[in-house]
Amino acid sequence: MGRKWTYSLMVEAVRYSLFTVTCDGTTKERTESNEMKSSILFTKSKVFALRIVRLYKHLRERKESVIAKQMLRSGTSIGANIAESRYAQSKTDFASKLQIALKEAAETEYWLELLRDSELVESSPAFDSLCGDCTEIIKLLTASVKTAKESV
């Protein structure tokens, strides 16, 4: 009657929890990552993606779409992979999703640098801020991937 079983469940943005559930229906939760940091990462990546979409629209209007399409794909994929990590099937899968998001962020940083260096986009406070946000997301993801891999 007092048998216990466990299962894994992704709860929020990039938060992994283990629940112990008894036969009588009571649960006990153990959180294994920093919920606040995860929420910040998810929010920043979503806001970043929206800014990337706006830049893409601007570039498309100017007929500068080849590099812009690559930037759009990688820039919006960051948040998508972070969102997908919420439903990871294991800690390994969770770490893998974050690693993919990190790779996409690095690719986006490359495309942004290429846009600036090729002078398709003029350096401006808004563009520099976008590049700064990309660097910040890379730093957050690097730390998150390291933590996730250590817990595997």
Short names for language-model regions:
Residues 1-80, 84, 88-152:
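Short, C-terminally biased terminal segments at protein or domain edges
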